[in-house]
A protein has these predicted regions:
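Consensus positions within tandem repeat domains that build extended binding/scaffold surfaces
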Residues: 60, 81-83, 104-106, 126-129
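Structural signature of tandem-repeat unit edges
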Residues: 32-54, 62-78, 88-101, 111-124, ...
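Short Cys/His-rich micro-motifs in 6-15 aa windows
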Residues: 22-31
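Cys/His-rich microdomains that often coordinate metals
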Residues: 8-12, 26-27
Length: 170
């Protein structure tokens, strides 16, 4: 599934540079106005970090539940511990290339989550990041093998198998 790199809409299509839902053209973080960033991040508590934005938590869980599928904007480089924890109606998450870190328990207890692609840029995944995600059967990861920075227990209480060297087209 493709996601708009700007608004996270699951309706974006490969090769399209302007999303039909948000009318945003993909542009680098430094070219976005504060208002554009605030609009794109309206569902999240977030903070600026050295080289991007960290999602701290979901502040509008109802919005996430209504969409079911969420794409994280391209300028997010970190997802904090427990940021999406207990978003029980979250079914799909689109993680952008450029994301570096997924914190402890970031998606723990997302009981309906079944579709995840982890881009190669992710060098750290914390303990229990996908713990108790019971509907998650397969996780597609771009890395050829588990990177050293991923906690050995990142899939705690989750029976998903990992398909290494995957592409987001799989």
């Amino acid at each position: 599934m493709k996601f708009c790199p700007m608004c996270g809409s699951s309706q974006a299509h490969a090769g399209v540079t302007v999303c039909q839902w948000c009318d945003h053209e993909e542009k680098p973080l430094e070219e976005l106005s504060k208002q554009e960033i605030d609009d794109l991040m309206a569902s999240y508590e977030y903070e600026w970090i050295e080289d991007g934005v960290r999602i701290v938590e979901v502040k509008n869980i109802r919005d996430i539940a209504l969409r079911g599928a969420v794409g994280i904007p391209h300028f997010v480089t970190e997802i904090a511990a427990d940021a999406f924890s207990h978003c029980k109606f979250l079914a799909r998450i689109g993680l952008p290339e450029g994301l570096r870190s997924i914190g402890d328990g970031a998606f723990a207890h997302c009981r309906d989550l079944f579709d995840v692609f982890i881009p190669k840029s992710v060098t750290h995944i914390g303990n229990g990041a996908f713990a108790n995600c019971y509907d998650l059967g397969v996780i597609c990861a771009a890395a050829p093998a588990q990177p050293d920075g991923w906690d050995t227990d990142w899939l705690s209480e989750c029976s998903a198998r990992v398909e290494w060297s995957s592409t987001d087209e799989d």
